[in-house]
Amino acid sequence: MMGIEDIVLGLNVDRESAKRLYEIISKEDCSDVCRAAVLTAFHFKGVTREEFMGFLDAIYKPTVSVDATDIVGTGGDKKNTINVSTASAIVAASLGIPVAKFGNRSSTGAYGSADFMADAGYSFPRDVEAALHRLKSNNFVFMLAPTFIPEFKIFSTVRKRLGFPTLFNYLGPVLNPLAPKKRVIGSASTEMMDVYSYILNELGYQAIIIRGQDGMDEITPFNFTDVIYVDGSVEKYVVDGRSISNDVRYDKISSQDPSLIRKFNFMGLKGENEDAAKFIALNTAPVLILNKKAGNYEDAYRLALEAIKSGQAYEKLEAIMHENKGLRHN
């Protein structure tokens, strides 16, 4: 069986060896130096389909599968934009789409998806039963990754010190404990788009995988975006976010200051920052298309933007938080 030495040498390993490798580096007696070596090796050599499936075999054992959608990005695109996936998830929920979001605090950027929810005052569910209750009662739940995959805590220090996207950035988007049947995944890596499409198709999920040609792990409003649509087969196409959202200012959706990003995020969801609102609506579009709420990106964008401008989206966040106050220990 191939192992750590092979990965460090830049060699690929088979599915079973990858599973065993994760079991080794996730043990408490494995040193951070060893973990860093493995994560760095994967960063430079890339991850194959077989290796990805091996890691999934070791980590991912969902007990349920819900008719809902997760929208998530890998992070690591170094753009320091607002957390658009979480805001888009709330917009989608306001339009009647069940959203089961799985995420974490930022490890490489200024502001992570869980940071947004924590700043809103959200109390994260502690188990699958509580998560299912939240989803049923308000069409929305946000699950914090380390709560459901405790081993992730072991890697948090190493990931922050490395400062670049690791294998866990790419694993995270497919590890949702409620196993929602629909996924929208933004990838900072072109190579990982094909891995995701293969994995999600193999697992029987419907999915839209996106990557901006400027490197953004979202639909970019500044360039073309590559898209892979997965639904029993795989279709590739390109979306021009510039022609859909029209003149989004980069300095209104991006900053290295977490407090400013937080401000942009909430103002965007309220419709008070038009550039951020457009960016959020643009990235809500694939969720609406996946759920047959719109037939094309232009119509989906307009529907999402109207939900923001009318106050419907922010009212949804307020409803989520109102219910959340009575569920602090669930």
UniProtKB/Swiss-Prot annotation:
Name what cofactor the protein needs: Mg(2+)
Question: Which terms are listed as keywords in the entry?
Answer: Amino-acid biosynthesis, Aromatic amino acid biosynthesis, Glycosyltransferase, Magnesium, Metal-binding, Transferase, Tryptophan biosynthesis
Protein name per UniProt: Anthranilate phosphoribosyltransferase
Name the family: Belongs to the anthranilate phosphoribosyltransferase family.
**A Pfam family in this protein?**
Glycos_transf_3
Q: What does this protein do?
A: Catalyzes the transfer of the phosphoribosyl group of 5-phosphorylribose-1-pyrophosphate (PRPP) to anthranilate to yield N-(5'-phosphoribosyl)-anthranilate (PRA).
Cofactor binding: number and manner:
Binds 2 magnesium ions per monomer.
Chain positions recorded as 5-phospho-alpha-D-ribose 1-diphosphate binding sites: 73, 76-77, 81, 83-86, 101-109, 113
Positions binding anthranilate 1 in this chain are 73, 104
Q: In which pathway does it act?
A: Amino-acid biosynthesis; L-tryptophan biosynthesis; L-tryptophan from chorismate: step 2/5
Show the InterPro entries listed in the entry. Answer: Anthranilate_Pribosyl_Tfrase (IPR005940), Glycosyl_Trfase_fam3 (IPR000312), Glycosyl_Trfase_fam3_N_dom (IPR017459), Glycosyl_Trfase_fam3_N_dom_sf (IPR036320), Nuc_phospho_transferase (IPR035902)
Any single Gene Ontology cellular-component annotation: cytosol
Q: Where does anthranilate 2 bind?
A: 159
| Molecular function per GO | anthranilate phosphoribosyltransferase activity; magnesium ion binding
Give the enzyme's EC designation.
2.4.2.18
**GO BP annotations, alphabetical order:** L-tryptophan biosynthetic process
Quaternary context:
Homodimer.
